[in-house]
Each structure stands twice: as structure tokens, then as C-alpha cells.
């Protein structure tokens, strides 16, 4: 992943959701980016809107990269990045105007559990951007742990939220992005196999797992970004 900056959610999609719903009114907004990765979303939001960003990730190398990008975009004074386990750290975080859950998977549980856990960290009028996906009607059996569209909406409602806007990811974009990512991964795997021939089987196993994941995303899942607010 060292070749990739945008390794999760699309900053452009998230910025459109913010603009479309008037969340960019006022530069004093406090934003919490959980699982911020290398800071692609955080840095862009700080640069475009002047938001105050708190990004958290468990990978030290990712946080170092995020700080580097913040310096490059001249928004270091607006961005604070932290190495921490979000499952633990979340308990002490309060009063954020916007929380971003950008493709973090089930680190905090399913969608309902995740939203329940972040709710206490929101301000009274705070919103959540959730970048996830749901299972399409047809798919292999190992996808049945993923919710379908209706089940996602049920989980959102049970957690005490409602949808302000839903952005469906375009399959051609997903395919293009996956091809780009797989190209980088393939290149690095070959380099690592040369450097560490005794671990060749581990790198090949990782590559195969990534290919399977890529196939699932392209053919059996619908990637979605939701803007959510508390239910009345």
C-alpha cells in the first residue's frame, strides 16, 4: 500500500455530500476521521473547507504519511493525526460535528453496532459519513455475512440514524480503481518475493486473497457512501 494515498473512501464523493447538504457552512467544524489511513480524506477536507481534523489510525506508517501530506498541502495547523486503536480511543472522544467512517469494515462491529458506538462522540447536530457496501442479490455463499440494501437501512434505523443522502459507487470506477490497486500490489509482491524468497508462499497467499476481494467488490457488492444524521 506504499504506492497508494487514497486507499479507502473517495475524497471527492465525501466533499460532494458535504457541499450538497450545507455542512461546509462554518470553518470551525470539528471532524473525526476514524481509520484515517494516509489522510487523503482528512487533508482534502482541511484544504477545501478549513475544517479542524482529528485523524486516528492504528498503523504508524500511515499516520506518518498523513502528516507528510498535511505538510505538503499546508494544512498541518488544521490536522492532528494520532496512532491509536479506535476501538479503545473512541470512548474518550466527544462533540465532533462530523465523523467519517471510511471503509473501516467491521472493526467496531456491524453497521448498527458501529453507529451506536460513534453516536456518543457526536455533537447534538452532528452527522456521520459512512462508506460501506451491501450485498447484491446474486453472489457466492461466503457473501451471506454481508447485509443487503434493506438490511443496511434497518441497521441504520435501529442505531438511531436516518439517511440524508446516498451515493452509489459506479462499477466502472470500482473496476478501474481495483485494477490500479492490484497493479501496485502485484508489483510489490514480486519485489518482496525477490527480497525474501523464504516467505514467497505468504506473499502469494496475500495476493490471491486480494484478487478474491477485488472480484467480490467488482461483481457482487454495491459500494455506497451515506450521509447520516440522528433520527428525530
Q: Where are the predicted features?
A:
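Class I SAM-dependent methyltransferase SAM/SAH-binding core
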Residues: 32, 40-88
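Conserved Class I S-adenosyl-L-methionine
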Residues: 169-232
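Short alpha-helix
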Residues: 145-160, 165
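A short acidic, Gly/Pro-enriched loop at the edge of an enzyme's catalytic core
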Residues: 90-99
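Conserved class I S-adenosyl-L-methionine
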Residues: 129-151
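A short glycine-rich, Lys/Arg-flanked "PGG" loop and its adjoining helix->strand segment in the class I
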Residues: 112-127
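Conserved alpha-helix/loop element of class I SAM-dependent methyltransferases that forms part
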Residues: 8-27
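A short SAM/SAH-binding and catalytic strip from SAM-dependent methyltransferases
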Residues: 98-111
Amino acid at each position: 500500500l506504499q504506492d497508494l494515498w487514497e486507499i479507502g473512501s473517495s475524497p471527492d464523493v465525501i466533499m460532494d455530500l458535504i457541499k450538497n447538504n450545507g455542512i461546509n457552512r462554518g470553518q470551525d467544524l470539528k471532524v473525526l476521521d476514524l481509520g484515517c489511513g494516509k489522510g487523503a480524506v482528512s487533508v482534502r477536507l482541511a484544504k477545501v473547507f478549513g475544517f479542524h481534523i482529528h485523524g486516528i489510525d492504528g498503523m504508524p506508517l500511515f499516520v506518518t504519511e498523513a502528516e507528510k501530506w498535511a505538510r505538503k498541502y499546508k494544512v498541518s495547523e488544521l490536522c492532528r493525526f494520532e496512532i491509536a486503536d479506535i476501538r479503545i480511543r473512541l470512548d474518550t472522544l466527544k462533540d465532533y460535528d462530523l465523523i467519517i467512517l471510511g471503509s473501516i469494515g467491521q472493526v467496531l462491529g456491524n453497521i448498527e453496532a458501529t453507529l451506536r458506538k460513534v453516536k456518543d462522540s457526536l455533537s447534538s447536530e452532528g452527522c456521520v459519513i459512512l462508506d460501506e457496501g451491501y450485498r447484491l442479490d446474486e453472489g457466492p455463499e461466503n457473501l451471506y455475512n454481508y447485509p443487503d440494501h434493506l438490511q443496511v437501512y434497518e441497521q441504520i434505523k435501529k442505531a438511531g440514524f436516518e439517511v440524508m443522502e446516498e451515493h452509489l459507487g459506479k462499477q466502472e470506477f470500482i473496476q478501474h480503481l481495483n485494477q490500479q490497486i492490484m497493479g501496485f500490489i502485484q508489483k510489490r509482491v514480486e519485489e518482496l518475493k525477490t527480497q525474501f524468497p523464504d516467505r514467497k508462499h505468504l506473499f502469494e497467499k496475500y495476493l490471491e486473497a486480494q484478487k478474491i476481494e477485488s472480484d467480490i467488490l467488482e461483481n457482487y457488492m454495491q459500494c455506497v457512501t451515506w450521509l447520516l444524521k440522528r433520527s428525530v
